[in-house]
Amino acid sequence: MAITAAQVKELRDRTGAGMMDCKNALTETDGDIELAIDNMRKSGAAKAAKKAGNIAADGTILIKNGEGFAALLEVNCQTDFVAKDSNFLAFANAVLDVAAASKVSIEDLKAQFEETRVALVTKIGENINVRRVEYIDGANLASYRHGDRIGVVVAGEADEETLKHIAMHVAASKPDFVNPEDVPAELVEREQALQIEIAMNEGKPAEIAEKMVVGRMKKFTGEISLTGQAFIMEPKKTVGEVLKSKGATVTSFIRLEVGEGIEKKAEDFAAEVAAQIAATKKA
């Protein structure tokens, strides 16, 4: 049976697949579009399963406000080229819309968009992963995105400009906690034990070592907490001092960065080029 251009166009419109893929699928089914779609979906699932082992450490961070909260979403792909692809971004934004509508869990988001994800993996040719979603509550929220790779939302009692500046600070300085006193006791105890050992190894008398450790611990908890850090816009003041001068407070924040915690495969380009040259010589 001859496959017409109209049939190929219809299949492309319905699946988003390439022209030759559509033509081949229709040829295999003697022009049966519905069967071709079924076969392409099966083939897509198989391809997606093969791609699942590929490391997806690139991607985008998106932010959207809901009713009294904000949603932050990370969707991953394998390359920065695909991270800018309109189809990839449309998929990520569709997931975000659902998340921001009713605080949908990451498990439910993945399940709801799995079929769409598989189709996109087939079309683009890279592993794609809806990795994580975070929600932050607050009547006063300010967000900041640094490019497509870092997203921050801050909640607190302050004017919008102040919270925006704090969000920018969080993006740059990566605090782990809001206040020094929020640092967990076990983390403080572990660091304190380490600092005592370091001071003793330096041969300091016990009294001096103790005072040194007190100072070092204050510095430690300050450096990993938002209000204890030097404010990037006024380095001579801490964030806490800036907030106090404005009668403002920060209650919570969330910071997401693309690929955090994902172990990326190290690429040795020199070795890759050498291997290509060797292969050429053999040929």
Curated annotation (Swiss-Prot):
GO MF, one example? translation elongation factor activity
The UniProt keyword set, sorted, is:
Cytoplasm, Elongation factor, Protein biosynthesis
What is the annotated localization of this protein? Answer: Cytoplasm
* InterPro entries, alphabetized: EF-Ts_dimer_sf, Transl_elong_EFTs/EF1B, Transl_elong_EFTs/EF1B_dimer, Transl_elong_Ts_CS, UBA-like_sf
| Chief place where the protein resides | cytoplasm
Gene3D superfamilies recorded:
1.10.286.20, DNA helicase RuvA subunit, C-terminal domain (1.10.8.10), Elongation factor Ts, dimerisation domain (3.30.479.20)
Residues spanning the membrane:
none
Cross-referenced SUPFAM superfamilies, in alphabetical order? Elongation factor Ts (EF-Ts), dimerisation domain, UBA-like
> What GO cellular component is one of the record's annotations?
cytoplasm
Q: Where is this region: Involved in Mg(2+) ion dislocation from EF-Tu?
A: 79-82
Q: What function does the entry list?
A: Associates with the EF-Tu.GDP complex and induces the exchange of GDP to GTP. It remains bound to the aminoacyl-tRNA.EF-Tu.GTP complex up to the GTP hydrolysis stage on the ribosome.
Record family assignment: Belongs to the EF-Ts family.
The name on file for this protein is Elongation factor Ts
